[in-house]
């Protein structure tokens, strides 16, 4: 029932009304909710430290102005978008949905985050996102990563650890991913210096 109310409020631009409703319903929410932002949808998770919970509370996408700025910068279909630390797809989902001719590459070492991203890709029927369960850095190496949410402020705060705790993960560079054909620039004369060292 609350999901239907939320989507009604989004469609009719009544986000402020939800601030009151959320204070009541937040205690009863247990399952993920589909939020329909008309041109794309997100699963939002109501658990306290889930980053996507912010969307349930505010009925807006995360960092909407930044997402819109990126979308407006994409002028042709030869563009690729690289989302490092993609989490549930806050940037990638709207960009891939609204610019469905470009290639979107998502990187996140968190299996939990990638599962949420995969669910959102499927929910939107998106075909132009490729995702990788790796960290991105200057050099290829292994590192440790802990995505136990109890250790962080929220699910958007996960980070690679300098300590020897958590799961061992791969770190790869954008240069290496291009050279190995994992990331394929659409133009052969792409500016490699523009992404060197990432």
Which stretches of residues belong to each language-model region?
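S-adenosyl-L-methionine
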Residues: 1-186
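Short beta-strand segments
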Residues: 133, 189-193
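Short gly/pro-enriched beta-turn/loop segments at secondary-structure junctions
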Residues: 139-140, 186-188
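Switch II (G3) loop of P-loop NTPases
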Residues: 195-197
């Amino acid at each position: 029932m609350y999901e239907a109310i939320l989507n009604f409020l989004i469609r009719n631009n009544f986000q402020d009304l939800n601030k009151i409703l959320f204070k009541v319903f937040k205690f009863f929410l247990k399952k993920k909710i589909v939020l329909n932002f008309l041109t794309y949808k997100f699963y939002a998770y109501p658990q306290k430290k889930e980053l996507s919970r912010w969307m349930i509370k505010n009925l807006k996408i995360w960092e909407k102005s930044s997402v819109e700025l990126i979308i407006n910068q994409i002028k042709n279909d030869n563009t690729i978008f690289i989302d490092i630390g993609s989490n549930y797809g806050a940037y990638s989902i709207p960009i891939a949905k609204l610019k469905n001719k470009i290639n979107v590459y998502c990187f996140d070492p968190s299996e939990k985050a990638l599962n949420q991203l995969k669910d959102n890709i499927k929910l939107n029927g998106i075909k132009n996102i490729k995702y990788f369960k790796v960290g991105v850095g200057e050099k290829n190496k292994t590192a440790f990563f802990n995505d136990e949410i109890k250790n962080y402020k929220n699910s958007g705060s996960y980070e690679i650890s300098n300590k020897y705790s958590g799961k061992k993960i791969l770190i790869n560079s954008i240069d290496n991913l291009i050279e190995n054909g994992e990331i394929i620039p659409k133009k052969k004369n792409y500016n490699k210096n523009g992404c060197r060292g990432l």
